[in-house]
């Protein structure tokens, strides 16, 4: 018998480095990487039933109802790649009601990784971000400055990358996370995200490796 595949949820505030870690996890563990936002865009582009319904809400400037998104997530998790190789659910659920909807469908992860980065570092990471309108490349004034003066002179800041906007986004994020804690409290693992990319991944890798080991032991003992 094959071991039960890995099922992982990951969450992190804006600029916590979650996107980078997801890429590393996906590459090493071959998990189906599922982001609700990407799913939503794909379904809308494909003109599916869920996509059409979601689009109606978005065009009115309203939030897409939980049931539509949960449906999309459920259908995606039923695809063969997610069933066979396991899955990485990225930045979802975001609220207690979304978590409950997944629980009702018996969709439960082995672990819920919470990337923990101090607020002042998150703010610094976001506020220092700059966009090169010519190439679309993202720079950071401190961590990855532009190669030359010419590029430096044309860099722009995205309108929602201001300190005020970041702090609002963080506030919303923390409220959302707070509401999830009760559902996942015994499987939440906080990983300090203020180290280097490799150091953060080493901790995640160790965690996922030990979960897989336990799953394999269970198979060999039955």
Swiss-Prot record:
Subcellular location: Plastid, Chloroplast
Taxonomic classification: Eukaryota, Viridiplantae, Streptophyta, Embryophyta, Tracheophyta
Main location group: plastid
Binding-site residues for ATP, renumbered to this chain: 15-20, 129, 195
EC numbers, comma separated: 2.7.4.3
PANTHER family given in the database record: NUCLEOTIDE KINASE (PTHR23359)
Family as reported in the entry's similarity comment: Belongs to the adenylate kinase family.
SUPFAM superfamilies, sorted: P-loop containing nucleoside triphosphate hydrolases
Cited InterPro entries: Adenyl_kin_sub, Adenylat/UMP-CMP_kin, Adenylat_kinase_CS, P-loop_NTPase
Gene this protein is translated from: ADK1
Keyword Protein biosynthesis: no
Chain intervals for the UniProt region annotation (LID): 128-161
Keyword Nucleotide-binding: yes
GO cellular component, one term: cytoplasm
Binding site for AMP: 41, 62-64, 91-94, 98, 158
Subunit and interaction comment: Monomer.
HAMAP family reported for this sequence: Adenylate_kinase_Adk (MF_00235)
Start and end residues of each stretch annotated as NMP: 35-64
Role according to the record: Catalyzes the reversible transfer of the terminal phosphate group between ATP and AMP. Plays an important role in cellular energy homeostasis and in adenine nucleotide metabolism. The maize enzyme also works with CMP, albeit with 10% of the activity with AMP.
Protein name per its UniProtKB record: Adenylate kinase, chloroplastic
Catalytic activity annotation: AMP + ATP = 2 ADP
Molecular function as annotated in GO: adenylate kinase activity; ATP binding
Keyword tags: ATP-binding, Chloroplast, Kinase, Nucleotide-binding, Plastid, Transferase
